Regions:
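Conserved ABC ATPase "signature" region
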Residues: 98, 102, 110-126
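Catalytic Walker B motif of ABC-type/P-loop ATPase nucleotide-binding domains
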Residues: 155-158
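ABC transporter nucleotide-binding domain
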Residues: 171-228
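Conserved ABC transporter NBD signature motif
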Residues: 58-69, 73-74
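Walker A (P-loop) phosphate-binding loop of ABC-type ATPase nucleotide-binding domains
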Residues: 37-41
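Hydrophobic anchor residue at the start of the ABC signature
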Residues: 144
Length: 228
């Protein structure tokens, strides 16, 4: 079963065509890498999946339900980590997750349980200091925990490893690889080694179109000897 289906999607801003007849599928419990240079249309696509931007054509399905601009019905299936997550810096990570859970309608008992589970998963159980003192990598890990609070069917991460050192990137990628047991992951990046490390499938976006798509084994086989 496919958690996400994008079919013939188009998007323009004024006379500039950003997304051109974009189609791809993300199978359940897979890690899907959306790779492309800055400005290729990755973030625009993610915002359309979230219903934050109107499509000019095509259809997007999450768990078989159509995404509609301005409506958040399908977002009950989705957890989202933006490229630069924002926090209340005066809070500890546990306090912050409890607040997010309360806003989402999760009971206090369940919120405490989920916060403990997720902080352990992302390696922040001993991080009792305020969030304003966190490194970029720690903030990204907390962002993943926040995105997973509601047990989403689809986790969307926009450039989660950008501006991180090699160790920080490895920590994030290890987490994303591990969570495929409980959810499906779509993440964007411009770093080829990231998708090679953990992705089941990738789509290379170039000037708003899919230039290359498939499993890593298929792509390596197609481009054997040409340096991919």
């Amino acid at each position: 079963m496919d958690t996400l289906t994008v079919s013939h999607v188009k998007k323009s801003f004024g006379s500039q065509e950003i997304i051109r007849d974009l189609s791809f599928r993300v199978p359940e419990h897979s890690v899907f890498g959306f790779i492309g240079e800055n400005g290729a249309g990755k973030t625009t696509t993610m915002k359309m999946i979230l219903g934050l931007l109107r499509m000019d054509g095509g259809e997007i399905l999450v768990e078989g339900e159509a995404v509609c601009y301005g409506q958040t019905r399908t977002n009950r299936y989705v957890g989202y980590l933006p490229d630069v997550p924002e926090y209340y810096g005066f809070m500890t990570p546990r306090e912050y997750l409890r607040l997010c859970a309360e806003v989402s309608g999760i009971t206090r008992k369940e919120a405490d349980k989920r916060a403990d589970e997720l902080l352990e998963m992302v390696g922040l159980t001993k991080a009792d200091k305020r969030i304003h003192g966190f490194s970029r990598g720690m903030k990204q890990r907390l962002g993943i925990a926040q995105a997973l609070l509601g047990k989403p069917k689809l986790l969307i991460c926009d450039e989660p490893t950008s501006a991180l050192d090699p160790l920080g990137r490895k920590e994030i990628l290890d987490i994303l690889s591990a969570v495929r047991e409980s959810t499906t992951v779509l993440f964007s990046t411009h770093i080829l080694s990231d998708v090679e490390r953990i992705c089941d499938q990738i789509a290379l976006l170039h000037h708003g179109e899919i230039a290359l798509q498939g499993t890593m084994d298929d792509i390596h086989a197609m481009h054997k000897g040409v340096g991919f």
